[in-house]
Swiss-Prot record:
VirG is required for the positive regulation of at least two vir loci encoded by the Ti plasmid of A.tumefaciens. PANTHER family: DNA-BINDING DUAL TRANSCRIPTIONAL REGULATOR OMPR, REGULATOR OF RPOS. The modification 4-aspartylphosphate is found at residue 64. This is Regulatory protein VirG. GO terms for molecular function: phosphorelay response regulator activity; transcription cis-regulatory region binding. SMART domains: REC, Trans_reg_C. One of its GO terms (biological process) is regulation of DNA-templated transcription. Its main location: cytoplasm. Phosphorylated by wide host range (WHR) VirA protein. It is found in: Cytoplasm. Keywords: Activator, Crown gall tumor, Cytoplasm, DNA-binding, Phosphoprotein, Plasmid, Transcription, Transcription regulation, Two-component regulatory system.
Amino acid sequence: MAGQDPRLRGEPLKHVLVIDDDVAMRHLIVEYLTIHAFKVTAVADSKQFNRVLCSETVDVVVVDLNLGREDGLEIVRSLATKSDVPIIIISGARLEEADKVIALELGATDFIAKPFGTREFLARIRVALRVRPSVARTKDRRSFSFADWTLNLRRRRLISEEGSEVKLTAGEFNLLVAFLEKPRDVLSREQLLIASRVREEEVYDRSIDVLILRLRRKLEGDPTTPQLIKTARGAGYFFDADVDVSYGGVMAA
């Protein structure tokens, strides 16, 4: 039975954008999610995909990894560097741990393997909407300054002292915010899994280690001897630097 149409409560339909070169799969997803009160756009290639992203508001993205001549992971990477929209990966075969780590590192938030049940797929869409990063919803105006860096939450931009921008995936961005909100507090891997907004049952502790390594490579002069993100052996990680917070350009007291 379909859920109540949000339009009856004066709310717009949530928009799901799907990229899959399988015509039958596109039709199935569009038909099923439409019945359950979603707006669905299904496309076959990255050109159409980017056109929709540029012209419409999208709440969840579903990317098939097996796109023939195109690389689904590259689409995930590109999207995650410029948007916090949740990304669900679908694959024709069950992903190995290493593939999941790579996908998480690039910015995916969930996985589902073909063939999958439509009810499970619907549930994952709804979960993705619930855990969408709050930064986008609240338009957080905070900026964090630390060491030689500034992180602007509203614009999702990490800027060096020289003024150059360093791109962050959604997972890297969320982890960095978690550290900056609690400088020098030890955060466990479980806390970091929650902060990165990925499903715990779909990942392994090592995926957090990979994200940490990526952040160190972007922030640290020598990532092998980190000065900012340090390891608390057996406990997790902590951010070892003073952090200043400003709100819309006004420094917090």
